[in-house]
Amino acid sequence: MNKILSRLFVLLIFVLTGCEQKGCAAEVEYEFLTPQVLVIKNPKPYMHTSHNVVKQGLWQKENALFRDKNGNILRKADVTTFAYFIFEKPLKDGETVSIAGTAAKYDSAVPSNIFKLNQVGNGVNQKQKYAYMGAWLGNLGALPLKHLAGKEFEIRRSSDGKTVCKGILKMRREDSMYQGNIPFTGEEVLELDYSNFNTPGKYYFYVENIGRSMEFVIDSSALNEAFYIHARGLYHKRCGIAKTQPFTAWESPACHQTVQLGRVPGNADHYRKGKTEKDFGFFDIKDNRIEVKHFDLIKDNPPYQQKIITAPGGWHDAADYDRRPYHLRIVSDLAAVYLMKPENFIDGQLNIPESGNGIPDILDEAAWGVKHLLAVQQDNGGVGTWFETTGHPGQGEGLPDNEKRSYYVSAPSRNGTMEYAAAVSTLALAMKKAGAKSEAEKYLASAVKAWNFAIDPGNRAVSWLRYKNKMISYREEPFLYGENLLKAGVNLFLLTGERKYLEPVLEDQKRIQESFSKDFWRWSPLTWMVLELYPVTEFAQLRNEYRKVILRDAEKMLENQENTYPYRTLWHAHNAGWVHAMAWGNYHPLRRAVTLIAAHKLTGEEKYLTGAYLANDFHNGANPLGRSMTSGLGKIYPAVFLDLVSYADNIGEFVPGITPYGNTFGIDRNAVKMVYNNNADKLPIFRRYVNLEFLSVPSSEYSVWETIAPAAVTTGYLLEKPTLPSTELKNRKPAGEFRKLPGYRALP
């Protein structure tokens, strides 16, 4: 029987990889999930084994795109083949098995990745805490674990191995199935509930005849570390400033110090041909609504006069270097979370260049997000909010400071300027709260100028432009977006006491209500938090509507978190209409948990805070893949992703604090063609984190506003005892070549 299985294994390797030994991806690695279950990475075809194998399986997964000897990225997947072996009997500690060209020694002291837990650690105030056990064995399916339910697990202290707590393994709910046949996790999942254990320290889990977990921490410092890494993801994406020691070991020169005044509109949504918009957007000479490519429009409409403005500030949007209007959400949300929990944020907390100026670092980071916009604000108050060029930078063009393209700031519009007014006035409120009087006055003055421009209908953006050798026209909406009008008006009223800022809002309440009902799903959950923090009598109804929607969404998330999947996550239920919409970071638990921290602030109810803690657990490794979702965070984290700076900086490890988009529900067609072929449908949905870098943008890229900032906002709210960063965090060095990191060939 064993010989037959061995021959089948050789055949499977040829079928799955299409290669002999010399064509396989890299050196052989192995790990034991249990004393009886071995995983070999990149196995050699074999005809014998020293131990009887009762089951064996295979899977292959891309790690990234292949690099040639010069470091050039090829349109070829670097694939790892995973071979799974279940032996007839468990190995003893120190016993060696010879199999698939490998001598694998079982060492009970080596942590098993069958344990899925928060790799950064839990705070001491977290009311519910869970780790999980589970594994997916490729075409073998779930590792059987149901028989362990009811058995004991231990928490052992790392320093001496002493058992400090015991609990009972429990089965989590059955795996959900999409349309009855596609699993979400592919696992049988056990739960380790340690909610009643809160003693600070370093520990690991132990289960007899299974093994031990990696270390985990219970301490407030774990939350400080998570917030630090996430928030510094923004610092590492700053534009216009050199990143240097002592603030980071991931150094790069200052970039994009200047910008030219451009002529094109700054609302990205208008460039797409809408289905219903008839009186705003782009139009041909016959007044038909048309779609326009922004790169082409910028090329075809250079400035009438070259006016160069020094404007460092803002953040690179993602892998490339544009600075977008969406980033104003970051400014607003960082300021809002400070107003929600000012006791959580202090000066010096993030080790950034502004640390030591007496202002909480989170507000300094928010201020960087408007620094460039202050520089381009026109005398009449108008602000262009999109900094863009004529094409995407690419591999081989070097660091951002080497970019040869000119950047242009979009023409001011009423709505873009009002969005700026809403964000910068929120920052002014936060600066005032922090006692930073001069900064608050500076941002207030800019917000007032922006308001005066935006509130004037005569400043509606209307223009003629050239596009592909034809003349086209553009006109923005004849109205102001309700969310920004209300937020800016209320903020300015609170800052000045002048009711004139409320009058346009009161006059437009009906349309604002309609906008809220239709479009709130697109807004940040913190958009109208100001109505809760500083109630204005005239807007009591809107405040109540805001509360209702936040609490409705939060309740649904908590229900899904507890009852839908084996691992507690905030994603839509398996049979919900939006379950497929995972791509572009929508799936991220810390992004979704912003709703939960809003609900907690509105009500003070512990359940919402607990839900946000559990979302942080999932993000940090208590998930089906057993990985942290953010580079440099935890022990197994994304080792490579689409990031042009990390490609060019000659630093082995990619920049920390970046949260790639990750799961996409479907599988990228490039991955199907290059890796999975007919096996694609067999990959469980929560394992569909395809990484082919620029060939799989919806999963391999990221953005500062979709994935990085929300994680900083949520973890900032969760902080229990804010402190200055440890010397270890401040002095962290790159770990080395990214292919050597545990996250590169992590289990699929």
Predicted regions and their residues:
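Surface-exposed, short loops/turns at beta-strand junctions within beta-sandwich domains
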Residues: 87-93, 195-200
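Bacterial Sec-dependent signal peptides at the C-terminal "C-region" and cleavage site
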Residues: 12-25
